[in-house]
């Protein structure tokens, strides 16, 4: 298991960019949920997650991402930027890539 590290690397009036490193699984999903809740509570309407160093994503993490997206409604977006092939595959298989913005 690899720990999850979340770091806010850039911020604008509209939203934030977050570096995501490690694994999002049942053990770390609450850490992601708390982090995203803090950003949403602060009024972020656009959250870009830099997923280049995200090594693993399971259904717990997917649930957190979808819940955060639902909380934003039509007023905002969550973008998963540059997920690794194994993470992209999970997003595609589960259909989450149609609910969240996934770039390249």
Task: Describe each model-derived feature in a short phrase.
Residues 23-99:
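Amphipathic alpha-helical interaction surfaces in cytosolic regulatory modules
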Residues 101-104:
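Short acidic-hydrophobic, aromatic-tinged amphipathic segments that line or gate anion-handling sites
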Residues 1-19:
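Short beta-strand/loop segment at the start of cytosolic alpha/beta domains
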């Amino acid at each position: 298991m690899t720990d999850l590290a979340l770091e806010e690397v850039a911020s604008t009036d509209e939203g934030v960019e977050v570096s995501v490193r490690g694994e999002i699984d049942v053990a770390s999903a609450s850490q992601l949920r708390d982090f995203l809740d803090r950003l949403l509570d602060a009024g972020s309407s656009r959250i870009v997650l830099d997923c280049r160093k995200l090594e693993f994503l399971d259904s717990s993490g997917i649930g957190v991402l979808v819940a955060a997206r639902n909380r934003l409604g039509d007023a905002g977006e969550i973008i998963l930027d540059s997920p690794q092939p194994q993470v992209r595959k999970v997003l595609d298989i589960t259909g989450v890539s149609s609910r969240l913005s996934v770039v390249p």
